[in-house]
């Protein structure tokens, strides 16, 4: 972020004393240079800045110098030649200076937040300041792009103030710059804290503390010492069987070859044999428990299934099965020449019997009517099934206009279809009449009840 230095034209203008003496480029009333001021003159050629004219004309309608009558701005003329001439005067860049806060009074206004005792002082920076000479009308554009302006470092925590042209080199070395650890890849480490981070980073390779000349990541050093380091003191592998010798890991093989461990090996074999027998016994016990649990699960599942299915089956036996079949895109299906002659519902599984509802949009015999039939798929002679059923063609605009047709008793002895060939005129089935919904769906309500068997009386 750039830091602006407050300045007046007096701070940067070349030959200002000479220009002030000529009185051509200063207002004769406020005695300020005409930088960024509009200059007006009376008919006699006496000029002053716009601000001074405004204050004067509020009280007196006359020229402040010659006292000639001036009723309003219309009596004045703009001194553009004077303004343009001043715009071409040379000055230095404010960033050719450095700014210091000093004790005691100066002619300069203190910056924001500074007291009268702590005021600013501009000091020419011959070594690092801007060397460019510019014209007055170029000041603003130059200051925007000046590479010598003061800026703050963009890294959080850094309070360094420096010139723009040295910002890049500073930020490359700034201690507050966030860098990535080469080892753990953390990307939130300040550059000045990187060396400290390396001292605790779990991924930094460090020397083994036991002098084995192997470099290991800090996080793995304990595992290395306990399991891999050749200089770690370890007991003989038959320690528990009686060999109490300890040695470096690198000496273990030599120890095993040099010392006869046959007795210890026998003890170990006996121990392992006992462990194998115990493990086999445990394994057999676990298998038996698994088998018992499996039987319990099957028994429990059957009980749950009966608990869920039985009430539903009893309800269907008593009250019958009810559902809806909603046929989407009915108009398209009815008009399509590629589709089959009839439409079949999904299978209805009712007490182990497979039912289907069949719709003939163009009729099975008479094309002027829609036909509706019921079919039982899994029945063959000599078996039979007595059924009571009904179909309701739902009118979505007026439920009272819905059409219901019912069969109180029919005996199925084969997968033959039973129902109505002339249920409703096909031309009536449209959205306007309410038989189709706005999204072209036909709804059929289904009721099916399997009737109880009738038995002949017993005689003896």
UniProtKB/Swiss-Prot annotation:
Keywords: Cytoplasm, Metal-binding, Repeat, Zinc, Zinc-finger. GO terms for molecular function: zinc ion binding. A zinc finger (RING-type) spans 27-67. This is TNF receptor-associated factor family protein DDB_G0290883. The MATH/TRAF domain binds to receptor cytoplasmic domains. Pfam families: MATH_2, Sina_RING, zf-TRAF. InterPro entries: MATH/TRAF_dom, Sina-like_RING, TRAF-like, Znf_RING/FYVE/PHD, Znf_TRAF. SUPFAM superfamilies: RING/U-box, TRAF domain-like. It comes from Dictyostelium discoideum (Social amoeba). Belongs to the TNF receptor-associated factor family. A subfamily. It comes from the Eukaryota.
């Amino acid at each position: 972020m750039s830091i602006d230095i407050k300045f007046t034209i007096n701070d940067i203008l070349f030959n200002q004393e000479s220009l002030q003496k000529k009185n051509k480029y200063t207002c004769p009333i406020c005695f300020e240079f005409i930088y960024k001021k509009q200059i007006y003159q009376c008919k006699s050629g006496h000029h002053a800045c716009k601000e001074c004219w405004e204050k004067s004309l509020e009280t007196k309608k006359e020229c402040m110098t010659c006292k000639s009558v001036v009723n309003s701005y219309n009596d004045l003329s703009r001194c553009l030649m004077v303004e343009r001439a001043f715009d071409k005067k040379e000055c230095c860049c404010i960033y050719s200076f450095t700014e210091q806060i000093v004790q005691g009074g100066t002619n300069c206004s203190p910056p924001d937040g500074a007291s009268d005792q702590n005021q600013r002082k501009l000091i020419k920076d011959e070594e690092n300041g801007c060397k460019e000479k510019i014209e007055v009308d170029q000041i603003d554009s130059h200051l925007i792009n000046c590479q010598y302006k003061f800026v703050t470092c963009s890294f959080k925590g850094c309070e360094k103030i420096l010139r723009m042209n040295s910002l890049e080199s500073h930020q490359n070395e700034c201690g507050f710059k966030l860098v990535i650890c080469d080892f753990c890849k953390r990307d939130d480490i300040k550059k000045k804290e990187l060396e400290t981070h390396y001292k605790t980073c779990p991924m930094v390779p460090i020397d083994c503390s036991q002098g084995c000349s192997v470099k290991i990541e800090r996080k793995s050093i304990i595992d290395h010492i306990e399991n891999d380091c050749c200089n770690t003191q370890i007991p003989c592998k038959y320690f528990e069987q009686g060999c109490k010798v300890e040695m470096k890991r690198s000496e273990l093989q030599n120890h095993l070859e040099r010392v006869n461990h046959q007795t210890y090996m026998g003890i170990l074999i006996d121990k392992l044999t006992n462990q194998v027998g115990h493990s086999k016994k445990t394994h057999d016990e676990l298998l038996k428990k698994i088998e018992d649990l499996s039987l319990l699960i099957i028994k429990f599942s059957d009980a749950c299934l009966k608990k869920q299915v039985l009430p539903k089956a009893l309800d269907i036996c008593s009250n019958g099965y009810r559902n809806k079949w909603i046929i989407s895109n009915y108009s398209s299906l009815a008009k399509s020449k590629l589709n089959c002659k009839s439409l079949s519902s999904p299978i209805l599984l009712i007490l182990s019997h497979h039912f289907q509802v069949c719709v003939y949009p163009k009729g099975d015999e008479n094309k002027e009517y829609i036909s509706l039939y019921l079919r039982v798929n899994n029945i063959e002679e000599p078996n039979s099934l007595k059924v009571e059923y009904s179909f309701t063609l739902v009118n979505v605009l007026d439920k009272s206009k819905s059409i219901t047709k019912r069969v109180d008793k029919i005996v199925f002895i084969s997968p033959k279809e039973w129902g109505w060939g002339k249920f409703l005129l096909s031309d009536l089935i449209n959205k306007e009449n309410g038989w189709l919904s706005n999204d072209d769906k036909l709804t059929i309500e289904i009721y099916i009840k399997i009737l109880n068997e009738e038995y002949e009386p017993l005689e003896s």
